[in-house]
């Protein structure tokens, strides 16, 4: 089962496991009680811990609460066409303690994207995610789709994109999801994608700039720029520019830019303190894959912050995120050294679902409505590097990006 499986209800291990013969149930208004079938009695307190609990949040998308002829609450899963007396929210109970003031649900590095969206209905929301055919992008897209959103997977490889769509449809055949061609290494492809999306006459509520390359050998794109810089930054910059009018018409809208903690370990200015284009798009002789990636991730935060400063007055906010360290995904496929390193580190790192959590949080959290210009790690706001917070550098990068795009478009003109 789609949403329920990822909520963790298939895992029966618990610090408060019930004794034999006991069952956990919920009332109509969400209070948890315990049935002792051996003695045919019920009670509010957990038989071992003595705690009282209630369920947190609404039902998962596609679920409905009903009452049978005996007055007992049961739950209908309309997605998978089944009923159960087990409340799907029991994985998210909170202690009822009058001595403690109520606090909102807290998410951290162990949270999953499906947990973030527990009880949310995203019907009517249109979401674009770049690089969504695999890895964290795929988990992000799947999580949105399983909660009712219309999700567009913007992918360079349409065969893989369509495979990703089918994998989501296998989990829920009514998911609203499609793949569209987008190659961020080509400004022409970005333009074609934007035109194709505009022709659909759809709103755009959430744009997730997720796609990235890492560890690639030096090469120039068809636009004459170093590929890591163009794919990870400039292509996304151009995409947002082309879709800006739709985002503004769809407000409140959000942009989420996937960056990395590696942004802290680089510099993009020369000795005089000016933005250095030769560092952003280096020659083959000056190229090092790790530095190129780090610089592009610094660009991501600078871009997100400046985007928020420019568009937040129009109802469009932008935040940047770090998904997690050493997550095993396809991003490192171009460099065997990192493939080996990521493989060895895999048992100690986040899952893909956990890696998608911070993106999903920034895209949907009610408490972030109207708020932007921030950087998040493990679903919590944190301070990026001093350089990432430099407004003058952000403006310089914005102006450089606009100039590079104008130059490339000018070369195509007859």
Swiss-Prot record:
One of its GO terms (biological process) is skeletal system morphogenesis. It is an enzyme of class 1 (oxidoreductase). Its EC number is 1.1.1.-. Keywords: Apoptosis, Cytoplasm, Golgi apparatus, Lysosome, Mitochondrion, NADP, Oxidoreductase, Phosphoprotein, Repeat, Wnt signaling pathway. CDD domains: human_WWOX_like_SDR_c-like, WW. A motif (Nuclear localization signal) lies at residues 50-55. The keyword Calcium does not apply. Substrate binds at residue 260. Disulfide bonds: none annotated. InterPro entries: NAD(P)-bd_dom_sf (IPR036291), SDR_fam (IPR002347), WW_dom (IPR001202), WW_dom_sf (IPR036020), WWOX_SDR_c-like (IPR042732). GO terms for molecular function: enzyme binding; oxidoreductase activity; transcription coactivator activity. The active site is at residue 293. GO terms for cellular component: cytosol; Golgi apparatus; lysosome; microvillus; mitochondrion; plasma membrane; RNA polymerase II transcription regulator complex. NADP(+) binds at residues 131-137. Residues 1-23 are annotated as: Disordered. The keyword Hydrolase does not apply. It is found in: Cytoplasm; Mitochondrion; Golgi apparatus; Lysosome. Putative oxidoreductase. Acts as a tumor suppressor and plays a role in apoptosis. May function synergistically with p53/TP53 to control genotoxic stress-induced cell death. Plays a role in TGFB1 signaling and TGFB1-mediated cell death. May also play a role in tumor necrosis factor (TNF)-mediated cell death. Required for normal bone development. Inhibits Wnt signaling. Belongs to the short-chain dehydrogenases/reductases (SDR) family. This is WW domain-containing oxidoreductase. The gene is WWOX.
């Amino acid at each position: 089962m789609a949403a329920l499986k990822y909520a963790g209800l298939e895992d029966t291990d618990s610090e408060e496991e019930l004794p034999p013969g006991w069952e956990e149930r919920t009332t109509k208004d969400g209070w948890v009680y315990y049935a002792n079938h051996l003695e045919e009695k019920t009670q509010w307190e957990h038989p071992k811990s003595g705690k009282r609990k209630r369920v947190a949040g609404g039902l998962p998308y596609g679920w409905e609460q009903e009452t049978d002829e005996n007055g007992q609450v049961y739950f209908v899963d309309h997605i998978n066409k089944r009923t159960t007396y087990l409340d799907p929210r029991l994985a998210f109970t909170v202690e009822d303690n009058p001595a403690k003031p109520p606090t909102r649900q807290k998410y951290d590095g162990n949270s999953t994207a499906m947990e973030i969206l527990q009880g949310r209905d995203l019907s009517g929301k249109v979401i674009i995610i770049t690089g969504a055919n695999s890895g964290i992008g795929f988990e992000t897209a799947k999580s949105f789709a399983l909660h009712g959103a219309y999700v567009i997977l913007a992918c360079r490889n349409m065969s893989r994109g369509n495979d990703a769509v089918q994998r989501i449809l296998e989990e829920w055949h009514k998911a609203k999801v499609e793949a569209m061609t987008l190659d961020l290494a080509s400004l022409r492809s970005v333009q074609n994608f934007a035109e194709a999306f505009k022709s659909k006459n759809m709103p755009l509520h959430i744009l997730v700039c997720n796609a990235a390359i890492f560890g690639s050998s030096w090469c120039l794109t068809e636009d004459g720029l170093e590929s890591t810089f163009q794919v990870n930054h400039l292509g996304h910059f151009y995409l947002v520019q082309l879709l800006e009018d739709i985002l503004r018409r769809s407000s409140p809208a959000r942009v989420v830019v996937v960056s990395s903690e590696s942004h802290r370990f680089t510099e993009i200015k020369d000795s005089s303190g000016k933005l250095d284009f030769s560092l952003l798009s280096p020659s083959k002789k000056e190229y090092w894959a790790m530095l190129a990636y780090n610089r592009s991730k610094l660009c991501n935060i600078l871009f997100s912050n400046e985007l928020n400063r420019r568009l937040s007055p129009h109802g469009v906010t932008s935040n940047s995120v770090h998904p997690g360290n050493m997550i095993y995904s396809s991003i490192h496929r171009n460099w065997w050294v990192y493939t080996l390193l990521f493989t060895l580190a895999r048992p100690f790192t986040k899952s893909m679902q956990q890696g998608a959590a911070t993106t999903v949080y920034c895209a949907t959290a009610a408490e972030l409505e109207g708020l932007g210009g921030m950087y998040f790690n493990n679903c919590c706001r944190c301070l990026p590097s001093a350089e990432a917070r430099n407004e003058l550098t952000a403006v310089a990068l914005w102006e450089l990006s606009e100039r590079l795009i104008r130059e490339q478009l000018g070369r195509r003109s007859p």
